[in-house]
């Protein structure tokens, strides 16, 4: 059967290995634990290095286990090509480094993961790339922030940690009007709940460590190229459209066509900086991917019940979740997430940091750690951990207060989760 006729739940299990492994007849994707690959002859080796033959060259660049994982995520996102790397942080870093140089500029929503914020606000400026952060609730701010040297707009489908939602299609129109790509982090959304490319995204990135892996056991990141952005017509990206002196004069738009973006990352950035995913991690993440839809359905089901419980609790000051009718992004939630979303969100306890810490320390089922999107329910205090690098003004702008608690709702029985939350709230 053709892939276009298959549903998500089938694709997440089969893409990349529709038949048994031809060498061993293994039905599971094998772990190809090797550093390098034998070329048939000298001409074959030259063709591989010249990008005329798309096969394996060296383990830092490609691996057959990794290749299945990349293809599967790309298909699930509706893209034409994918690249798996060592972590979500590496994926986001490469996504920007691939199309920026010293003197360039990025526009980003300010309601993003603290690690991404630090990358854009502090690390990339060391290399001459600056970022303007905007309030995504007013789309005019995106338009006003774009400059002649702006090379990308960056947002998340669901903001971290508050699960705010941005009008993707409207931001895409703004970016494309200025001939620059829209890069979206879909880690919290997952391709099961939303496919940003269908709403105008050009590049999608994931921390595969989260929902894709789903079990808190392996690090990984993925970059998916939609193949839709016209790098030549834009005229702003010589890295892709002009001969690359570091790769014997290749023009990536000629060598890779619509997959030029991810091909350049693999051929140059991954080659030179080596944030390579291990074959074993790619295998583990593939195992997680096969049950993505099943887990996400349970995550969302549990989360909505927890939101309702917290929203009616006398010791809770505020719940930040777009499913609530009074949430400012509720209409966007209904539009972009008809099947629900937001199993990672924040709420604010009455009092402050002392009460928040006492609540967290009293939980028994929820684990206090920095990860999210695990089958196990998780909790953390953002202001003193994940977002602690932000100053007081930056925290307030992201609506992270001393009493703010982030929850990542797992797949346990809902009655047990609510009972745990209830006993912990009773202690503050």
Residue map of PLM features:
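N-terminal "arm"/small-domain region of PLP-dependent enzymes with the aminotransferase-like
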Residues: 2-63, 71-72
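PLP-dependent enzyme catalytic core of the Aspartate aminotransferase-like
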Residues: 9, 80, 121, 130, ...
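Conserved small-domain helix->loop->beta segment predominantly found in fold-type I
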Residues: 273-276, 280-282, 287, 291, ...
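Conserved N-terminal alpha-helix of the aminotransferase class I/II PLP-enzyme fold
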Residues: 41-93, 115-123
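Short hydrophobic/aromatic beta-strand micro-patches
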Residues: 224, 346-348, 408-410
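Active-site beta-loop-alpha junctions enriched in small/polar residues
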Residues: 158, 187-189, 324, 350, ...
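Conserved PLP-enzyme active-site core in the AAT-like
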Residues: 2-3, 16-20, 83-312
